[in-house]
Design a protein with these regions (language model features):
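Thiol-/selenol-based redox modules, centered on thioredoxin-like
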Residues: 135-138, 142-191
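N-terminal "domain-start" segment that seeds a small globular fold
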Residues: 28-50, 134-135
Length: 191
């Protein structure tokens, strides 16, 4: 009888320890999330996303010849409004949709700063679709929560990342950066 009790007690302890280890492993992965990626800045220098640890991040695939390109103004506006509260926008130029980002990195940088006075970080041009999809976008589209996953369908798809590096929400291109929906989501993460 005593041996049966000890075996049961041992089994319970093993289950509890395994459960705790799984929770810790999940937390460790979630804590690293987006921070594990390093891409190049628009100037071609390595720019680790870990530099933004502790900030709320909006990741956006951008293009300079798209019907949604005027969203640069609203992106810059919300960046200016919230940057001192720990918010940053990261723009990733991509030429995957209708060849609407054909320029070089230098041309993209000039366009963004002259036409829209962009001050938030813009990265070097990448691909957001397969077969040459950047690892960051593989993560965003395949390794996040089911409501967030899915192929990028067009320019200016946005991903909101919490202060721990976890992707918490996705906004399709038609959702403007200054919309009530997006502003509320950003403010919720900044609290």
């Amino acid at each position: 009888m005593r041996s049966s009790y000890l075996q049961s007690l041992f089994a319970v302890r093993v289950y509890l320890i395994c459960g705790a280890l799984l929770i810790m492993a999940g937390s460790l992965f979630a804590a690293s999330g987006i921070y594990t990626f390093t891409l190049n800045s628009i100037d071609g220098k390595p720019a680790p996303l870990a530099d933004y640890k502790g900030k709320v991040i909006l990741v956006v695939n951008v293009a300079s010849q798209c019907g949604y390109t005027p969203q640069y103004s609203a992106l810059e506006s919300i960046y200016e409004k919230y940057k001192d509260k720990g918010f940053v926008i990261l723009g990733f130029p991509a030429n995957n949709f209708g060849h609407q980002e054909p320029g070089t990195n230098e041309e993209i940088k000039t366009f963004c700063t002259r036409k829209y006075s962009v001050t938030f970080p813009i990265y070097s041009k990448i691909s957001v679709k397969e077969p040459d999809q950047a690892p960051l976008y593989t993560y965003l589209t395949k390794e996040t929560a089911p409501g967030i996953q899915g192929e990028i369908k067009w320019n200016f798809t946005k991903f909101l990342v919490d202060r721990n590096g976890n992707v918490v929400q996705r906004f399709e291109p038609a959702v403007t950066p200054d919309s009530k929906e997006m502003v509320a989501a950003i403010e919720k993460q900044l609290k």
